[in-house]
UniProtKB/Swiss-Prot annotation:
InterPro entries attached to this UniProt entry: Calcineurin-like_PHP_ApaH, CNP_phosphodiesterase-III, Metallo-depent_PP-like
Organism: Synechococcus sp. (strain ATCC 27144 / PCC 6301 / SAUG 1402/1)
Name the record gives this protein: Probable cyclic nucleotide phosphodiesterase syc0937_d
Binding positions (Fe cation 1): 19, 21, 59, 198
Binding-site list for Fe cation 2: 59, 89, 157, 196
Residues spanning the membrane: none
Amino acid sequence: MVEDFAGDAMTLSIAQITDLHLLVDPQAALRGCVTTPRAAAVFGNLKQRSPDLLLLSGDLSEDGSPASYERLRDWVEELGCPAIAIAGNHDQPERLTEICGRSPFMGEPVYSIQGWRIIALDSYQPKRIDGRLRGDQLDWLDQRLGEDSSPTLLMLHHPPVLIGVTKMDAIGLKDGPEFLEVIAHHQQVRLVLSGHAHQAFIQGRGLTTFLGCPATAMQFDQPELPAGWRSLELEPDGSWRSQIHWVDTDSIHFA
């Protein structure tokens, strides 16, 4: 099923956030990083920018607690735009769906939005850090891409390409080569967004660009950096622009 969403302008403004790692205790720290205030600061920044659509690319909760997903749901409702969320390896997918699987969250895996298609993929594996799409989902993706030639954005949690960081490449998308083979036959795939790496990266393969996004939680290789997110502007002709934003959280106090 394809869900249609009509925005107000020709340019589609998207915000991508990832790897929030929210905890049941909003004051608790993960690897020395108090994750909840950082995520709250990013949502405050997003409210000032009013994106048309929010993409959340996994690891939304660290502990899978109902309180963490309820907090996330409340922030998205306050933001006031539709949102597409996928699970990362730290998430509890069933709980994510139960708590966040209703408006403003959009529940279908394929969306038609202002001349673009957005397809959300599931790379989650129970009790695994690495990811896998599996053959049935790859076959499904191949079929979906074959039915519409509109410019397409794909989102998954695990990077499907090697990013040059040994520890991260070892826990990326295990069937990345098979995924790349599928999309190589569909030149309308313009963007592939991922999380998991806790850093921004960009790679190009043919007409497809692969983009990584910094975390709202800690950045693995540069822990001194603040919370980050990615903005994208998509045009109906398939062109796009993107920018990384950093949000200073030093003065943020979350209660």
